From Swiss-Prot:
Pfam short name (any one): tRNA_m1G_MT
Alphabetized Gene3D superfamilies for the sequence: 3.40.1280.10, tRNA(m1g37)methyltransferase, domain 2
Subunit record text: Homodimer.
Protein name as annotated: tRNA (guanine-N(1)-)-methyltransferase
Record gene name: trmD
UniProt entry tagged with the keyword tRNA processing: yes
Length: 250
């Protein structure tokens, strides 16, 4: 059974109980599909205060994470995960994480994630040890722990056996370059709003067509940039044209 090992270098290992103890990722850990280990740079300091940061050269606000504690933690993580493990630094300067990137990461046997804090980490550590830098969006967080958890969750969903239904990951938003279609469950009528009749018809071909059209329409309205990088089939073009026409006529 294929599995993924993820080691995280973080000042707050307790945060990752959200991954190991809850939801799909917890189930993956229990099934042996995901192995998660955290390494705290404070454990690799030698001074009384367990100092992991210092003032930046050149002045300026904030503090910068020191190289040595990070480097020593990385040595231990690589000893456990293997030298071939890909080292990833989560930072606003990285490439934006997309579903296609997640698919590539899910093919890995081992990942080592670096969760920075303060103003960031010493650039010399990045140059010497980091294979890839990834960002989860154009905004700033207090540290790399949440982005690391986002990456772990997204990758875990693609591990064979991690989801309850084999098709669930394939039907997620972005998997085929489109946003997801609307979903409904019981009751059929709520506050005078009805579930679309096509979903109650039992006609699987019509349902598939409706769902594809809704995905295309949502993507057109909310994330048109995704359509620019996707080649639409003849059926998809027709469905999108129908969607736009019906929307404009309503």
């Amino acid at each position: 059974m294929a599995s993924l090992r993820v080691d995280v270098i973080t000042l707050f290992p307790e945060m990752f109980s959200a991954i190991s103890e809850y939801g799909i990722t917890s189930r993956a850990v229990k099934q042996g599909l995901l192995q998660l280990t955290c390494w705290n740079p404070r454990d690799y300091t030698t001074d009384r205060h367990h100092t992991v940061d210092d003032r930046p050269f050149g002045g300026g606000p904030g503090m910068v994470m020191k190289i040595k504690p990070l480097e020593d933690a990385l040595v231990q993580a690589k000893a456990a995960a293997g030298e071939a493990a890909k080292v990833i630094y989560l930072s606003p300067q990285g490439r934006q994480l997309t579903q296609s990137a997640v698919r590539e990461l899910a093919k890995s046997d081992a990942l080592i994630l670096i969760a920075g804090r303060y103003e960031g980490i010493d650039e010399r550590f990045i140059e010497a040890h980091v294979d890839e830098e990834w960002s989860i969006g154009d905004y700033v967080l207090s540290g790399g722990e949440l982005p690391a958890m986002v990456m772990i969750d997204a990758v875990t969903r693609l591990l064979p056996g991690a989801l309850g239904h084999a098709d669930s990951a394939e039907e997620d938003s972005f998997t085929d370059g489109l946003l997801d279609c609307p979903h409904y469950t019981r009751p059929e009528v709520y506050a005078d709003q009805r579930v679309p009749d096509v979903l109650l018809s039992g006609n699987h071909a019509h349902i598939r067509r409706w769902r594809l059209q809704q995905s295309l329409g949502r993507t057109y309205e909310r994330r048109a940039d995704l359509l620019e990088s996707r080649s639409l089939s003849g059926e998809e073009k027709k469905l999108l044209e129908e969607y736009i026409r019906e929307r404009d006529d309503s």
